[in-house]
Curated annotation (Swiss-Prot):
Inactive ADH is produced under conditions of low pH and high aeration, where the bypass oxidase activity is highly elevated. In spite of having 10 times less enzyme activity than active ADH, inactive ADH is not distinguished from active ADH with respect to their subunit compositions, molecular sizes and prosthetic groups. It seems that in inactive ADH, an improper interaction between subunit II and subunit I/III complex impairs efficient intersubunit electron transport in the ADH complex. Residues 42-145, 189-304, 327-417 form the Cytochrome c domain. It is found in: Cell membrane. Residues 1-36 form the signal peptide. Heme c 3 binds at residues 340, 343-344. This is Alcohol dehydrogenase (quinone), cytochrome c subunit. The modification Pyrrolidone carboxylic acid is found at residue 37. Optimum pH is 5 for ubiquinol oxidation activity. It catalyses: ethanol + a ubiquinone = a ubiquinol + acetaldehyde. The gene is adhB. The lineage of its organism: Bacteria, Pseudomonadati, Pseudomonadota, Alphaproteobacteria, Acetobacterales. Its EC number is 1.1.5.5. It comes from Gluconobacter oxydans (strain 621H). It is a peripheral membrane protein.
Length: 478
């Protein structure tokens, strides 16, 4: 039998043991919760990066709108559509989407209600997104994005093109089956990562690959042949240039370092971003990791050249000499001297990382003159980035020069300094471009169309001396 003193001591020791066990259990629970929270935060952070890779914010944010709340006007060949609200708002956004719903929308272009989204969303490329990347992006949109109760705008498309059910047929006809994740057949892991970035989240082919009769991207990878990344159709009256290794009109004269710097800052010594690519750099690629930029560059430099005309010859100095003598009655030369030479120089070399060269520039000598004509008429903006914080604006000349004068200077630049671009731009071409938005050429579409126009926001404030650029480049920069 235990005496009272012994019994009390045992009870006291048992209580102390219970307290210690409870404390240890509480610490374990707290540690587990903290560890889970850290894991969740890491997943959200990873998802934010994947969303940057995919450039979601550029399309799903209206000019001066709230991030990811949609409302961006996109003028397609069949009518106007508006990007949707992808914040976690349960009524107007995707707050009620499960991970399965989210995955189906990204990879198949099918909404929670079963309707097919318009292929302005690059879901054929997003089908390449890995399970881990989709899971991370879902965590970001559900827990890292502020919900915005903004109702989606209805598309402005005439019947019968407004019907969505044919989009399922379009998907079946033109969207190939994709294997998610990195292509395991590529032996070099860095090149494989670059291929994944270019053809998956980066969806580069949406602009840099020509389109077919159904307005579909002609090729989603090297299996598509020479069309793949060989230069796109008119989108916002900009022609995305070839990303193949062609010396004249592609990346043949670019180094890997050039590509990395271009994607990070928007400018290198011999080129600068223009049109929609300004948005891509501002919103997406400047935020990519150095390893991902290097992988992208390495993959692009692995791409072979495709057959092309001889659009660049040897500069014999005659263009520079003509300009040094005042143009001597050459209409295009005189327009150039009075409006262009102060930045792009008489020898067409420009100023490194400020005013791109015109001599040998792929944008100038490419077969389709639409981009050059568009920047002459409407101007352009070199956006500020973290690594190159200065913005540079080129004014448009549509209110200063006649259509004939703009045509003259475009033709002059396409034939000067050894440039040997084909064709001639007329005053009528400029007039249509300026007033109706019709591209000078529609070769990339295989159809007569003004192409897509996505009025994109830019990360500029009202206090800048130029109005915020739109994806059309119609920014009226001062």
């Amino acid at each position: 039998m235990l005496n009272a003193l012994t019994r009390d001591r045992l009870v006291s020791e048992m209580k102390q043991g219970w307290k210690l066990a409870a404390a240890i259990g509480l610490m374990a629970v707290s540690f587990g919760a903290a560890h889970a929270q850290d894991a969740d935060e890491a997943l959200i952070k990873r998802g934010e990066y994947v969303a940057r890779l995919s450039d979601c914010i550029a399309c799903h944010t209206a000019l001066h709108g709230q991030p990811y709340a949609g409302g961006l006007e996109i003028k397609s060949p069949i009518g106007t559509i508006y990007s949707t609200n992808i914040t976690p708002d349960p009524e107007h956004g995707i707050g009620n989407y499960t991970l399965e719903d989210f995955t189906k929308a990204l990879r198949k272009g099918i909404r929670k209600d079963g309707a097919t989204v318009y292929p302005a969303m690059p879901y054929p490329e997003f089908a390449r997104l890995s399970d881990d990347d989709i899971r991370a992006m879902y965590a970001f949109f559900m827990h890292g994005v502020k919900p915005v109760a903004l109702q989606n705008k209805a598309p402005d498309i005439s019947w019968p093109l407004s019907m969505r059910w044919p989009l399922g047929m379009w998907r079946a006809m033109f969207v190939p089956s994709m294997t998610p994740g990195v292509d395991k057949s590529i032996s070099d892991p860095e090149v494989a990562r670059g291929e994944y970035l270019v053809n998956g989240p980066g969806h580069c082919g949406e602009c840099h690959t020509p389109r077919g009769f159904g307005m579909q991207v002609k090729a989603y990878g090297t299996a598509g042949g020479n069309a793949y990344l060989a230069g796109g159709a008119p989108i916002d009256n900009w022609i995305a240039p070839s990303l193949r290794s062609n010396s004249d009109t592609g990346l043949g004269r670019w180094s890997e370092d050039d590509i990395v710097t271009f994607l990070k800052s928007g400018r290198i010594d011999h080129s600068a971003v223009f049109g929609g690519m300004a948005d891509v750099v501002a919103y997406s690629t400047q935020h990519w990791s150095d390893d991902d930029l290097r992988a992208t560059a390495k993959y692009l430099k692995s791409m072979p050249a495709v057959p092309e005309g001889k659009n660049l010859g040897q500069d014999d100095g005659q263009t520079t000499a003509l300009l040094n003598k005042g143009g001597q009655g050459n209409a295009g030369a005189e327009v150039y001297l009075h409006n262009c030479a102060i930045c792009h120089m008489n020898d067409g070399t420009g100023v490194n990382r400020m005013f791109p060269p015109l001599a040998g520039n792929p944008v100038v000598i490419t077969d389709d003159p639409t981009s050059l004509a568009n920047v002459v008429a409407f101007g352009g903006i070199l956006p500020p980035t973290n690594s190159a914080p200065s913005a540079v604006a080129m004014p448009g000349f549509k209110n200063h020069l006649s259509d004939q004068e703009m045509a003259d200077v475009v033709n002059f630049m396409r034939k000067g300094w050894g440039n040997n671009a084909p064709g001639t731009v007329s005053a009528s071409d400029i007039q249509k471009l300026r007033t109706t938005g019709a591209p000078v050429s529609t070769a990339g579409w295989n159809v007569s169309s003004k192409g897509w126009m996505a009025y994109m926001p830019q990360p500029y404030g009202e206090d800048w001396t130029f109005s915020p650029q739109t994806h059309t480049g119609v920014d009226d920069a001062q």
